[in-house]
Curated annotation (Swiss-Prot):
Keywords: Amino-acid biosynthesis, Asparagine biosynthesis, ATP-binding, Cytoplasm, Ligase, Nucleotide-binding
GO molecular function terms attached to this record: aspartate-ammonia ligase activity; ATP binding; catalytic activity, acting on a protein; transferase activity
Similarity field: Belongs to the class-II aminoacyl-tRNA synthetase family. AsnA subfamily.
Catalytic activity: L-aspartate + NH4(+) + ATP = L-asparagine + AMP + diphosphate + H(+)
Record flagged with keyword Kinase: no
Organism encoding this protein: Bacillus cereus (strain G9842)
Protein name in UniProt: Aspartate--ammonia ligase
Superkingdom field: Bacteria
Pathway terms, separated by semicolons: Amino-acid biosynthesis; L-asparagine biosynthesis; L-asparagine from L-aspartate (ammonia route): step 1/1
Length: 327
C-alpha cells in the first residue's frame, strides 16, 4: 500500500522549498521579471485561455458597470498582451504566480479544479521562431528541474533521484509512427517509461492518421512549435505532465489555425486583432504546474496531497482506503 514519505507538516515545509527554489532559478535562467497576475479578465477582451476550446470559464458580472468577467483558466494570452503594454523588448520576459479555477476539469490523481502554476512569457525575434530555439528553452527549464531534484536530495535523501541526464525530444507524428496501435495517452506512457523525461513537439493539429495527439486552443500556441514536458512518475508508474509550452502564434499561424477550428469570430477580439495586425510582440511561453512539481519531486500519489482543493466525498473515501491523505 502507498505510504507518503513525509507527514503533512513536513510536506508543507517541503512544498515551500520546491516553489522557492524553482521560482528563483526560473527567473534567473530565462531572464524573467515577476509581475502581478489577474484572477479574472473581461469576456470581450478575448484574453482568457479557452484551453481545448470546450471548457466553460466561470462568469460573473461587475456591479459597477454590469460588464461580464471570466475567472482565468490560464494567462497564456494575457501575458503576451502584458509584455506589449509594459514595454518589454526581445529577449525580455515576465512570469507570474497564477491561480485559476477550471470547473470542467475531470478530477483524478493529477487533476484538480484549482490550478496553480508559474505562467511565463518572453519576447522573441522572428528568426527565433524555430524548433531549435524551442528545444534550447526546454533544455534550460529541464536543467532547473534537474538542479531542483539535486537540491531536494541533499535535504531529503529518502526522496531519491529519478531524472535522466538529458530530456529526449520527439514529435507527435514520430510518436504516432512509433506506437501506431496505442492511444495518444498510452503513447505518452510508453515513451516516458522508456526515457524518463521527454518533450513531445507539435500538439494541436491533426496527425497523418487524422487524429490529434491532443487538443490545443487555436489562438496561443503555434501547433508546429509547441509541446509538453513529460516525466515518468515513480509512484504512479505513468507519464506525468509538468509543463505545456511553446512558441506562440504569429499572424500567419493564427490565421490558419482559426480557419481550421472554425473560430473566425475571434478575429474581432482585441487580442486576436493585435496578432493578426502584427501589433503584439512575437513570444514564447508556457505554464509550469506548481502542484504538479511538488507532486513529482515529493513523490506523492495524489495532487490533493500538495494543494488545498475541494474533492467529492466518494473520491476522498477512495483515497483514504489507499492511505492517501488529502489536504
Amino acid at each position: 500500500m502507498y505510504q507518503s514519505l513525509m507527514t503533512v507538516r513536513e510536506t508543507q515545509i517541503a512544498i515551500k522549498e520546491v516553489k522557492t527554489f524553482f521560482e528563483d532559478q526560473l527567473a534567473k535562467r530565462l531572464e524573467l521579471f515577476r509581475v502581478s497576475a489577474p484572477l479574472f479578465v473581461t469576456k470581450k477582451s478575448g484574453l482568457n485561455d479557452h484551453l481545448n476550446g470546450v471548457e466553460r470559464p466561470i462568469e460573473f458580472d461587475m456591479l459597477h458597470s454590469g460588464e461580464e468577467l471570466e475567472i482565468v483558466h490560464s494567462l497564456a494570452k494575457w501575458k503576451r498582451f502584458a509584455l506589449h503594454e509594459y514595454g518589454y523588448e526581445a529577449g525580455e520576459g515576465l512570469y507570474t504566480n497564477m491561480n485559476a479555477i477550471r470547473r470542467d476539469e475531470e478530477l483524478d490523481a493529477t487533476h484538480s479544479i484549482y490550478v496553480d502554476q508559474w505562467d511565463w512569457e518572453k519576447i522573441v525575434q522572428k528568426e527565433w521562431r524555430t524548433v531549435d530555439y524551442l528545444q534550447k528553452t526546454v533544455q534550460t527549464i529541464y536543467g532547473i528541474f534537474k538542479d531542483l531534484e539535486d537540491h531536494l536530495f541533499e535535504k531529503y535523501p529518502f526522496l531519491g533521484k529519478y531524472l535522466p541526464e538529458e530530456i529526449v525530444f520527439i514529435t507527435s507524428q514520430e510518436l504516432e509512427d512509433k506506437y501506431p496501435e496505442l492511444t495518444p495517452k498510452d503513447r505518452e506512457h510508453a515513451i516516458a517509461k522508456e526515457h524518463g523525461a521527454v518533450f513531445i513537439i507539435g500538439i494541436g493539429d491533426a496527425l497523418r492518421s487524422g487524429e490529434k495527439h491532443d487538443g490545443r486552443a487555436a489562438d496561443y500556441d503555434d501547433w508546429k512549435l509547441n509541446g509538453d514536458i513529460l516525466f515518468w512518475h515513480p509512484v504512479l508508474q505513468s507519464s506525468f505532465e509538468l509543463s505545456s509550452m511553446g512558441i506562440r502564434v504569429d499572424s500567419k499561424s493564427l490565421d490558419e489555425q482559426l480557419t481550421k477550428t472554425g473560430e473566425d469570430f475571434k478575429r474581432e477580439y482585441d487580442f486576436h486583432k493585435g496578432i493578426l495586425e502584427d501589433v503584439l510582440p512575437l513570444t514564447i511561453g508556457g505554464g509550469i504546474g506548481q502542484s504538479r512539481m511538488c507532486m513529482y519531486f515529493l513523490r506523492k500519489a495524489h495532487i490533493g496531497e500538495v494543494q488545498s482543493s475541494v474533492w467529492p466525498d466518494d473520491l476522498r473515501a477512495a483515497c483514504k482506503k489507499e492511505n492517501i491523505h488529502l489536504f
